[in-house]
Every structure is written in C-alpha cells, then in structure tokens.
Amino acid sequence: MVKCSLIRALMVIAGLIGAAAFTTPANALVTLDLRKGNVQPMPIAVTDFQGDLGAQVSQVIAADLQRSGLFAPINKTAFIEKISNPDAAPRFEDWKVINAQALVTGRVTKEADGRLRAEFRLWDPFAGQQMTGQQFYTQPENWRRVAHIIADAIYKQITGEEGYFDTRVVFVSESGTKQQRKRQLAIMDQDGFNVRMLTDGSDLVLTPRFSPSRQEVTYMSFANQQPRVYLLQLETGQREVVGNFPGMTFSPRFSPDGQKVIMSLQQDANSNIYTMDLRSRTTTRLTSTAAIDTSPSYSPDGARVSFESDRGGKPQIYVMNADGSGQTRISFGDGSYSTPVWSPRGDLIAFTKQAGGKFSIGVMKPDGSGERILTTGFHNEGPTWAPNGRVLMFFRQAAGAGGPQLYSIDLTGYNEQLVKTPSYGSDPAWSPLME
C-alpha cells in the first residue's frame, strides 16, 4: 500500500524573516536566449547552513540550482568569509571579489516538538542588501523536500519564474535481463532520490501519468493478460480499471481539470482517441479513422489536443479541438513524429522524431512552426515537461546498453543530464508542483 508521508506529512509555514523581501531580482540576471541556445549561468554562492543537517540541505540546494543550467554555484574553497551568523549581513566586499552575483545563507534547527525549522536568506552582494528570506517547518525525514522548496524560492526570486525542484516523477523502473525484464511503476523526487515502488512487477506497466492533483496516476497495465488503462490512488494504493472496453486501451492522460482521462482504444487494426468522464463514466469518441491515432495530450487550457496519427502513411503530429473537430497536421519535417506532449505554458509541443536511423527529442510551436531538435541519439523517447515548461525529461536507450536511462534537458539543448535511478528507467512523467 502506498503511504502518503511525502504528500501530506510536510507542513510548511513560510514567512519573511529580517529585512524586507525585494521584488526585483539580483542586478546580474540570468541571460537566456532559447533561439541561439546560449545561457550565461549566474555565479551564486551557497554557503553551508548552520545546524546538524545544514551542510546536506545546502548541498541539495546547490545541486538543484546547478542542474537548472541557469546558475553556477561557486566552489566553497573560493569563499573568503566564513558565515557564522546567517542572520547578520555578510561582508559584501568579500563576495564581490569572487563575483558572487547572489549569496545564500541559512540554518537548520530542531524545535522542541521534534520538527525541523529551515530558514534561509538570499543576498545581493553588489547591491549590498537582502533580496528575500523565508523559513519552513517540517518533519526531519522530509529535509530534502525543504531543500527543494528553498531552491524553488531562490529560482523564482532571481528569474521571476516558478521553479520545478519540489516535484516528483513517476516512471517505469526496469530491472533484470532483456529476456526477463521486470517493470514496476515507481515514484521519485525530480533529482532521482527517494525512489519508491508502486507496483510489484508481476504485470507489465507502461506510460504512467500524474493527475493535476498529484494524488492519482493513470497508466497502462497488462494485468490478467488484458491491456487496460488503470487509475492508481497514491495515498491508498487502490487501483481501478478505466472503462471496460472490448479492445486494448493505452496512452492515457488526464485532462487539465482532472475530470477526464483521454486515451486510445484499439479496434481491430485501428485505434482511435476517446475521453472518459471520471464521474459519470461516459465516453466520447474524438477521432474516427482507419489508422492508428494515439498519444493524446491536452493543451493546458483544455481547449485543444495534440496526438499522433499514421493516417498519412507514417506517424505525424496532429492538433484538434477538445471536441474532436478541426483535426490538422502540424509536423512536416523529414522522418516520423510521435509522443507529442503540450508544454504547461501552452507555447510549445515536445515530441519524439525518428529520422536517419536515430531518435531525437524536439519542440515545435502548436502551429508546427519553429521546430527545434534538442538532442539526438540511438533511441531517445517519451518527453515530459517540468511544471514550469523550461525543462524536459525523457528516456534513452544507448546502442548495446543493458537498459534505458532517464535524462533531463532544458530548452536550450545545452544542459543534458543523467537522472540517476537505482535501476533502468523509462516512460517518465513529471508532476505538478507540490503543495
């Protein structure tokens, strides 16, 4: 049974501490040009927090910021000032000497009731002032989550955009040989830590997807040798079949309001796209072709759906209205296109492209213009968006490798990183921000 310790156990009380929180970012902002793929990361000094868990918390914060590609944490050996009192103003000149455009100080203390209190301050050395400060309370076992929350706060203060570090990823954990591969649903923090198995591996599972509430996951399972779409309650571990259809159902995904599941239903050699209302259990057919229509994904406003179809001879990306009208092809490059997924911002659609014997992860605008390839390899597939729409995660099977691995990459295409998992991993799906 799935426990909810990471879902509900964290009680966060955030508030400003000390000086006023300025709404303007640091004087040296992150420079991001997605058209050219150029990023000038901001040098930032993340000091060891005071307290027993302080060093570990600051290490997670620095790792989060570095992985974003927008920040360059300064090596601690370059620090001139040793912070002994995180409440006091630092010696700004010492931090300007090492070009720290931003400085993070803080402490972690244990309260009388057993909770941890984590507090931080973000400073602008060149302006000589505090930018923001907050404090959070949680249970000791959730110290990593507090570190992610602090990293999100720093990211937002400096970039003006929401962070994505306090999020989770559901994926398919793969172990064993290719001939006897065991596949389990698993969930983890976005940095690969705190992995938990959600299924026992007795049945093949594919394409898990989070609900907007983060409390449910929909996925495809071959339980009882019958491919079906299931709903899994993360808190209780209870699962149920989504509809009792005569054919195979697959490629499920929630609507933005969480009221529907959109999926593909196979009928003979064809498959079409349907929605099911989770309250009334009524279904609506959106496509009707003698082809394979699959991989549907809603736009963030729920008004449109992108999907994959081979109705033109090979898989391509199409867009239609949420009621099935206005079906329009948007991909016209060389090769075939699959697994389209709409950005949370609504401005881009990510996809898998197969051409020249290789698989690429790319993005295009919803009208098909502005196609950009972010990474190419032997087999890259299954992009999923971070909730801020700036980073993608996908899985890669290298030539001759034992199994697939998860990777992340930002929209510049120049910050590709391995997401380490205990075993092989595929089919990642990013959660919305935690609450």
Swiss-Prot record:
GO terms for cellular component: periplasmic space. InterPro entries: 6-blade_b-propeller_TolB-like, PD40, Tol-Pal_TolB, TolB_N. The keyword Cell cycle applies. Keywords: Cell cycle, Cell division, Periplasm, Signal. It holds the Pfam family TolB_N. Residues 288-310 are annotated as: Disordered. Residues 1-28 form the signal peptide. It is found in: Periplasm. It comes from the Bacteria. SUPFAM superfamilies: TolB, N-terminal domain, Tricorn protease N-terminal domain. HAMAP family: TolB (MF_00671). Part of the Tol-Pal system, which plays a role in outer membrane invagination during cell division and is important for maintaining outer membrane integrity. PANTHER family: PROTEIN TOLB, PROTEIN TOLB HOMOLOG. This is Tol-Pal system protein TolB. The lineage of its organism: Bacteria, Pseudomonadati, Pseudomonadota, Alphaproteobacteria, Hyphomicrobiales.
